[in-house]
Amino acid sequence: MTSALVLLGYLAGSIPFGVLLTRWLRGVDVRTGGSGNIGATNVTRVAGKKLGAVVLLLDAIKGALPVVLAVRLLPDAPTVHVAVGLAAVLGHIYPVWLKLQGGKGVATALGVLLVLVPQAALAAALVYVAVFAVSRVSSLGSLAAGATAVGTSALTARAVEYAGLSALLFALMLWTHRGNILRLARRTERRF
């Protein structure tokens, strides 16, 4: 059952809502505009705030639902919950449907954390909003949110495995944002 849940997590994470919705509703491929990323930030740039918000919500849900299922089926198996959540985020970053060229995993990670460490997800979301409101730089908000999730998870997670997952997700976020980090250091990162 564990393998099936992990596979389900990966396949759910692989659903490229940003690509599908911009193509179906706007007739454009989000990968050819803005940053070329498939996530909510670039969808907002390419197709508008409303569609960006829908993609944000759907990307979070595709992280949350497989984890909810794993928690319901195997309530005393935090390692399985972590594996399923990690698989969902990796599915978003490396989707089988897009030749492993996906997004940065921020919204999907938020969905995973909403289930496993809701306090960390809430704190991260609040920090993102605050940092973005001041800086108008989405990547800076995402990185600050990821760091906040790690700290909050260390203090509030019900299982040490969940705190470890938060740290691992932040490490993945650093990897997927490596170009953004360089641009932040050079002060050339895009603002909204």
Swiss-Prot record:
Record-level GO cellular component terms: plasma membrane
Any GO BP: phospholipid biosynthetic process
The protein's Enzyme Commission number: 2.3.1.275
Major place of residence: membrane
UniProt-listed InterPro entries: G3P_acylTferase_PlsY
GO MF entries: acyl-phosphate glycerol-3-phosphate acyltransferase activity
PANTHER family with a match to the protein in the record: GLYCEROL-3-PHOSPHATE ACYLTRANSFERASE-RELATED (PTHR30309:SF0), INNER MEMBRANE PROTEIN YGIH (PTHR30309)
Identification of the protein by name: Glycerol-3-phosphate acyltransferase
Source organism: Myxococcus xanthus (strain DK1622)
